[in-house]
Amino acid sequence: MAVTFSDLHTEEGVKSVEEHLAGKTYISGDQLSVDDVKVYAAVPVKPSDAFPNASKWYESVASQLAKSFPGKAVGVQFGGSAAAAPAVEAEAPAAAADDDDDMDLFGDETEEEKKAAEEREAAKKDTKKPKESGKSSVLMDVKPWDDETDMKKLEEAVRGVEMPGLFWGASKLVPVGYGIKKLTIMFTIVDDLVSPDNLIEDFLTSEPNNEYIQSCDIVAFNKI
């Protein structure tokens, strides 16, 4: 039976993962599965020690994924989620104190001093601003040439495309008509690393995969 999680960027969402993992190693049992990758992609940062099950699971999934991508990583941070709000709020008093340092109590601030203060403020904002690298969930239709196309081999060709930042998810065969079926498949991407258009043009509909795949259409595209 499918498990439903929501708002995994919030403490409440992570709590639901924590409770689900009680007595389990991974989302769907004792082995890593596509379910773990999908949930991992939706959790922006490692859960705190307040959620020991979720924290241990997150580290385990990260370790398994690292083995699949042996290239040297420089580290990526994800910004813009509600989970990051406390850290930003914690910095606010310090910023206010810095603002006080720039005040001229006697009203004698010159244009040069004012410009210098503005430059310092801009530099502080640039330092605090995290570099964002968002994730997206994509639903795609993959169409065969005809009813004689081996759909098992077609799906193997699709899932055989591997690259950093690309995570294949659940799939199903959907009847189109005249005995033809299409493959509907979900996948998650790191936006800075993978372009759906390039994935389709350079890998899925080019040789050798075009032996089975006629065309691909993006059905849904949602930011995580």
Swiss-Prot record:
Name the SMART domains for this protein.
EF1_GNE
Database matches in PROSITE patterns: EF1BD_1, EF1BD_2
What Pfam families does this protein's entry cite? EF1_GNE
Indicate the segments forming the GST C-terminal domain, all copies: 14-65
Which cellular components does GO assign to this protein?
apoplast; cytosol; eukaryotic translation elongation factor 1 complex; plasmodesma; plastid; vacuole
Keywords recorded for this protein, A-Z = Acetylation, Elongation factor, Protein biosynthesis
N-acetylalanine sites (modified residues):
A2
Q: Which domain of life is it from?
A: Eukaryota
Residue ranges, annotated region (Disordered): 89-139
For bias type Acidic residues, the affected ranges are 97-111
> GO molecular function of the protein, one example?
translation elongation factor activity
The family database entries (InterPro entries) matched by this protein are listed as:
eEF-1beta-like_sf (IPR036219), EF1B_bsu/dsu (IPR049720), EF1B_bsu/dsu_GNE (IPR014038), Glutathione-S-Trfase_C_sf (IPR036282), Transl_elong_EF1B/ribsomal_bS6 (IPR014717), Transl_elong_EF1B_B/D_CS (IPR001326)
Q: Compositional bias of type Basic and acidic residues: which residue ranges?
A: 112-134
Q: How would you summarize the oligomeric state and partners of this protein?
A: EF-1 is composed of 4 subunits: alpha, beta (1B-alpha=beta'), delta (1B-beta), and gamma (1B-gamma).
Q: What does this protein do?
A: EF-1-beta and EF-1-delta stimulate the exchange of GDP bound to EF-1-alpha to GTP.
Membership in a protein family: Belongs to the EF-1-beta/EF-1-delta family.
State what protein this is by name: Elongation factor 1-beta 2
